[in-house]
Structure formats: C-alpha cells, structure tokens
C-alpha cells in the first residue's frame, strides 16, 4: 500500500517525508508547479494606486511569497497605510513573518465566504481593493466586494502550471508503488488527475 502525494513543491516533498518518517509508503508526484505570475512585474504600479485606508487582500501563501519577493527585488517595502487581509490564518501568518505588518483574517475557516463574513468588510463602498492571487480560482471575493461598492483590482502574483507526465511511465510507477490512497488539496488538481489516461 502506498500514498500518492500530488501537492506542489515544496509542501508535497515535506508531506511525503513526514509520512515516510511515520512509517508509511509514499511518493511525491506533483500535478502542478508554482511559478511567478504574469502580472507580478506590475505589482508596484498597482500598489501605488492605493491610498491610505484602502484594502489589500492576500489570497494564498504563494501570493504572499511571490509579492514579497518582487518588492524585495525592487527594494520596496509594503505600505504601512493599508488594511491587510489574509484568506486564512496560514496565509496571514506567512505575511506577518515576512513583513511584520498586522493583518486581519477569519478566526475560523480559510475560504472567501469566511473572509467576506468579517464585520470590517461589510461597509467598503468607494474603497480601493487590490487582490493578490494566482491564476484561475474562484471569483466570489472580487464579485462580492464589487457588489458592496468597492473598486476592485487584481494582480496575478503566481500561476499554477499543470505538469504533463508521460502517461505510460507514470502509470507504471503508480502500479509498481501499489498506490491505494491519493492526497491532494485542490479540486482542479483532482480534475487534472481524473482527466489523465494513466489512472
């Protein structure tokens, strides 16, 4: 019996190693890789459009990492005049560790619905909002903030790129490893897996 870990690097390798250390048979075959987003180079311009009291949303740890990396490359710092929001606790903690800025996030849950339920986001009419995100994903947050009267802009800080394995080789590896369990964390990865010929 073996467990197939499909999470991207480095989290996938870390999870695989923890399972092996716990005495489980596991192997890592990520279905996506994470790369810099198509709009990362214009992040600074988008930040400069925000004014004191505007809102900046960080929608994943990858968005935090790539945005922070870009600002460091430009020798720029995060503005201290904005309200920062994280999609959840892990994203917020990543941001706080890298920047030392305070950031708000839902006490429970890590979804757009949880974030939108915060009382401080109910009255945001005419406020500028910048969403730092990856490619694809849900539009609920942007749509709802616009419905509440916010002026919403987005910046694709990172992108998820599907890895195209050679079907026959991967099918043989999966069979030889006697995979019985699959560990993933996003619906789009499961769809990619199910659409492949090697399962």
From Swiss-Prot:
Enzyme Commission number, as recorded = 4.2.1.75
| Annotated InterPro entries | 4pyrrol_syn_uPrphyn_synt_sf, 4pyrrol_synth_uPrphyn_synth, UROS/Hem4
Give me the segments passing through the membrane: none
Biological process (GO), any one: protoporphyrinogen IX biosynthetic process
The record's keywords, sorted A to Z, are:
Lyase, Porphyrin biosynthesis
Q: What class of enzyme is it?
A: lyase
The annotated pathway is: Porphyrin-containing compound metabolism; protoporphyrin-IX biosynthesis; coproporphyrinogen-III from 5-aminolevulinate: step 3/4
GO MF, one annotated term: uroporphyrinogen-III synthase activity
The record's listing under PANTHER family reads: UROPORPHYRINOGEN-III SYNTHASE, CHLOROPLASTIC
Function, as annotated, reads: Catalyzes cyclization of the linear tetrapyrrole, hydroxymethylbilane, to the macrocyclic uroporphyrinogen III.
Similarity section: Belongs to the uroporphyrinogen-III synthase family.
Which protein are we looking at?
A: Uroporphyrinogen-III synthase
| Organism per entry | Proteus mirabilis
Q: Which gene encodes it?
A: hemD
């Amino acid at each position: 019996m073996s467990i197939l870990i499909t999470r991207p690097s480095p989290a996938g390798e870390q999870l695989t190693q923890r399972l092996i250390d716990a005495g489980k048979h596991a192997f890592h075959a990520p279905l996506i890789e994470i790369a810099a987003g198509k709009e990362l180079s214009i992040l600074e311009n988008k930040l400069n459009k925000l004014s004191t009291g505007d809102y900046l949303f960080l929608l994943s740890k990858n968005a935090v990492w790539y945005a922070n990396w870009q600002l460091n490359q430009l020798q720029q710092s995060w503005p201290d005049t904005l309200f920062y929001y994280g999609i959840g606790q892990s994203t917020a903690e990543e941001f706080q560790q890298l920047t030392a800025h305070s950031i708000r996030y839902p006490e429970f849950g890590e979804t757009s619905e949880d974030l939108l339920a915060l009382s401080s986001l109910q009255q945001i009419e005419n406020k500028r909002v910048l969403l730092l995100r990856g490619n694809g994903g849900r539009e609920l947050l942007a749509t709802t903030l616009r419905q509440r009267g916010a002026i919403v802009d987005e910046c694709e800080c990172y992108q998820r790129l599907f890895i195209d394995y050679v079907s026959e080789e991967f099918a043989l590896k999966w069979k030889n490893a006697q995979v019985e369990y699959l560990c993933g964390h996003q619906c789009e990865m499961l769809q990619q897996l199910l659409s492949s010929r090697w399962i």
